[in-house]
């Protein structure tokens, strides 16, 4: 795992691994701030586990303070696709997977290239997906299609974050970026229900600072945004299943209708102005 992390840093932030004084000082500071040692330990530890064991261990260790509502909305058998917002990154997938495991122990989730690079050995629970079209290749797409065909033929539930990237911090809270139409296309092809899911949680101040100041630091800091969630509250709410036939036949409109259902699950409250803004925006489409 240490070699993978060093290679990732060299690729994403090459100036950090230079041998000049400033780079060395900053790198040593970031190693402590971003818990590199713990990342390496956890990565090495789970390599000897099965996919389910690994992600349940990560969930118990790092998303242990998670509450969930609506597990009864998950079908007891057959394929379905849980469609969620993406506020934190890896922590969203780990928290949702480990909670879903209580009622479905055969789930899988869509994982981006960073997640696959670090934890790519767990092929039985991950479907690799490249959200950045510039990085997409024919071979990568072929692997994804083959993996999905296997998972859905086995009647397994999936977890997807259609934004493909982490939510953006704004003055009105966390906003998901534009959603891909993938859930709608998959539901039409495979004829399974879509399950709206809202995840509430947030990343560290350093991550949001880096997001607005330095893309390279942001990429490096993502390594820490699972391991700093221990004892921090994460809330998950699962809505009722949605048939794709209940949505618009226009895929662009259908994905916005589905997003509205996810945003409707946001917690209500006096200061939840972001919920009001979201629903006002997407209500015009539904």
Model-based region annotation:
Residues 72, 114-116, 133, 201-203, ...:
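Residue-level detector of flexible, active-site-proximal loop/helix-junction positions
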Residues 36, 80-137:
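Catalytic core of membrane glycerolipid acyltransferases/transacylases, capturing the structured
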